[in-house]
């Protein structure tokens, strides 16, 4: 596939068809019913017309068409009735204490969870670390761009759930903690460890950041100059310098599954605002719930029409007197050559409760404060 630059496809009956989800080298994935998956597997190709072409041949050379093997509704119902019994579920859930190996796991009785600093699966998340500072709005001036993305960026582009590349920031973290590549598992299985998940944010092998010169994968340039570095390494450098970050997107930013880590990882990278042409509804809400401001361009503007290349610094003005839903704001652009530009924005905080979420630095600190105050 690499040497011939092939665009290969997979067929699956799962509920996700994100790029590179089945395999990093696969660029096309199609969702379909289980019988169709079997049919395409028998055919061995994706460019087949099942109405006119046979999917296989019998041992004596006769053509076999999909219509010859497609089960009728009565056959499906009969098979389900024979193989699926209510007793199966009764037996499975009758003993909720778990198997013997589960019972042998040692645990100490305590009111709270005993965090294991050496665990690569579960770590104490930092989402409550800012509770004492909640109510203090972060500055939105001098922001550095971390990524300039296009249209239809999915939550899987932002926070992939598939395999963990050994040469990426998350893979290097696991290797440094004694985990061999064969034991990496997946991002989805390690979502209890923020150190892994933050390193995996914007690290999808198929994401394209305009700041990375056309390179595919989770790369960017610090200050928009020099060699490509990982998104995570760049964010760490900006944190050392005390500079906040901004991400630009196109239309339908955050589409796909409502993956919470797409917003959590964005927050933990140090991103303070995301500016896009439009947002998917749930991801917009999740960003606010993590204390990240979503803004939409107005008047047809976008990163391309503004000529953004990643060397700029940005400030967002118009929120100095407090936040309110659907507020107008101005994006001030300071270019590397000293010139200035601006664009009108719409704050996509849509309700008063979302104002509370943001000013509390997210929904988690807000809930904790309410519990403590009781």
Question: Which residues are covered by each model-predicted region?
Answer:
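Fe-S-dependent hydro-lyases/dehydratases of central metabolism
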Residues: 1-374
